[in-house]
Amino acid sequence: ALATGAQPLQMQPERHDRLVALTSHLPYLLACSLVAAVEQRGNDDPGVWDLVSTGFRDTTRVAASDVRMLSDILQTNREPVRAALGQQRRALEALEAALDGDADSLQAALSAIRATRQRHFPPAPAENE
């Protein structure tokens, strides 16, 4: 693991399962759900696939992961994954509420999220523009 740049962490198994459900398994499910949503729209209007961007491709990259392996991981960690899905559902509901509010509320919510991401993943100079 060290040869690949990984930093080993010691923690209780239950904590590990909760955290990777949120940071690894949930992103996989979100990528899958995004592809499924566009596919569903594509059934009515195949032109939707002509409009997907590199952002869509990047965001959904993990949806191309090994299904058998991920299915096993999801089944093994079912309860932590369900909890992560609930947490994500609440985050989406908060964004939906911000969207229903005024422009300032939406911008404030998105700015706070952007700041959190940049705090954990500082942008490269070109990304800051």
Features from the language model and the residues they span:
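Short, amphipathic C-terminal "tail helix"
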Residues: A108-E129
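Residue-identity detector for glutamine
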Residues: Q7-Q12, Q40, Q75, Q87-Q88, ...
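Interdomain hinge/lid region at the active-site interface
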Residues: D45-I113
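A structural signal for well-ordered alpha-helices, especially hydrophobic packing surfaces
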Residues: L30, L92, E96-L99, R117-A124
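Generic alpha-helical propensity signal that fires on short helical segments
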Residues: S24-L29, A37, M69, N77-P80, ...
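Juxtamembrane/interface motifs at transmembrane-helix termini
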Residues: V38-R41, G101-S105, A126-N128
